[in-house]
Regions:
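Short, well-ordered amphipathic alpha-helical segments that serve as non-catalytic structural scaffolds
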Residues: 57, 80-95, 151, 195, ...
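Short coil/turn connectors at secondary-structure junctions
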Residues: 99-103, 130-133, 158-164, 185-186, ...
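Active-site-adjacent elements of ketosynthase-type condensing enzymes
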Residues: 114-120, 166-186, 216-233, 279-288, ...
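Claisen-condensing/thiolase-fold acyl-transfer catalytic domains that form or cleave C-C bonds
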Residues: 92, 110-111, 121-124, 129-131, ...
């Protein structure tokens, strides 16, 4: 399987972290927080956390405090189909593929629920064929891009589906929740909105040759409570614990070692690193575990700086950035991780 085109999309409104702090301080919600919570929010929004700006599906920042089930769902249904469609259109254009040529579409999300799913909306807007195979994948959190691509690879390998459209879209601002839990507060300061897409084909395209060589996954259910969504008061509430950076690095290294061993590849052969930018501390833990420099993970750091953690689309933003930069070819390691606790990785052969 080859990745023959990628595309990304974000909401039009982009906010600096300092703007978020200023708006929060002026809100009624801020007055309801305890002293510790206020200090956490100030430290994360005003400190050096690796994030400068985030794109949010909010016409005004103070709309972030409209935290009711109906308001959050309305935000998701308004923005998720639009972002998914925009990213897909750009991926199709990059691949030089017309929508009717797509045989299957897969969409991953964890920040909202629709029935029929997002594939119904995106397929209609894109003009995909009525007989397209449409699969909605949910519940995989920040790591969803790689399982989505693994599913696409299985469809392509079956010989029944030629070109597959893979989309990840998250409206994290439709899953904001505020209380005095540190993980909840940090989540509100960390996550942004966006969508990423890729077109997959059994043959290479006209651009850079990106071959899906091999992949691996790891599911550690014993660590489930370290990172997951729960339902509270009819809304999603993110559980984010301090163990996440270490767990991400540990499990990523396990998947990496297993995948390389199966493919008889040595670590020194890896020339590119495409990591999900889960946060500053996550990237630092990955750098330490893999003995990498800031330059090695520069695309991940840049995506985090400009967009925050967008959950599942983030790693597709990093891949697109590396390709656009003209990063040296060879074997690239692409990895995502998230709720489960799950971790996924893929070897890409790039020319």
């Amino acid at each position: 399987m080859f990745i023959i085109g990628t595309g990304t999309a974000t909401p039009p409104h982009r906010y600096r972290q300092q703007e978020c702090w200023t708006t929060l301080k002026a809100s009624a919600r801020f007055g309801e927080m305890n002293v510790r919570s206020k200090a956490i929010m100030k430290k994360v929004l005003m400190g050096d956390n690796g994030i400068a700006t985030r794109h949010l599906a909010l016409d005004q920042l103070d709309h972030a405090f409209e935290i009711t089930p109906d308001a959050l769902h309305a935000r998701f249904i308004k923005n998720a189909p639009m972002l998914a469609t925009q990213a897909a259109e750009r991926a199709l254009a990059a691949a030089k593929i017309n929508p009717p040529e797509i045989d299957a579409v897969l969409i991953s999300t964890c920040t909202g629920y629709l029935c029929p799913g997002l594939t119904s909306y995106a397929s209609e807007r894109l003009g995909l064929r009525p007989d397209v195979l449409a699969l909605d994948l949910v519940g995989q959190g920040c790591g969803a891009a790689l399982p989505n691509l693994q599913t696409a690879q299985a469809l392509v390998a079956s010989g029944h589906y030629g070109r597959v459209l893979s989309i990840c879209v998250e409206v994290c601002s439709a899953a904001f929740y505020l209380d005095d839990d540190a993980g909840v507060l940090i989540s509100a300061c960390l996550f942004g909105d966006g969508a990423g897409a890729a077109v997959l084909s059994p043959t290479a395209g006209s651009g850079r040759r990106v071959k899906w060589k091999s992949c691996g996954s790891l599911l550690q259910s014993g660590d489930r409570d370290c990172l997951r969504f729960e339902q509270k008061n009819g809304m999603l509430r993110n559980i984010l614990t301090p163990q996440v950076p270490a767990l991400a690095a540990q499990h990523c290294e396990t998947v990496f070692a297993d995948t390389l061993a199966r493919n008889q590849v040595k670590r020194r052969q890896i020339s590119g690193w495409i990591f999900h930018p889960g946060g500053r501390d996550v990237l630092l833990a990955l750098r330490e575990k893999f003995q990498l420099s800031s330059h090695d993970v520069r695309q991940s750091e840049a995506v985090l700086r400009d967009h925050g953690n967008m959950s599942s689309p983030s790693v597709l933003f990093v891949l697109q950035a590396a390709l656009a930069e003209g990063a040296p070819g060879g074997l690239w390691w692409m990895s995502s991780f998230g709720a489960g606790f799950s971790c996924h990785g893929a070897l890409l052969e790039v020319e």
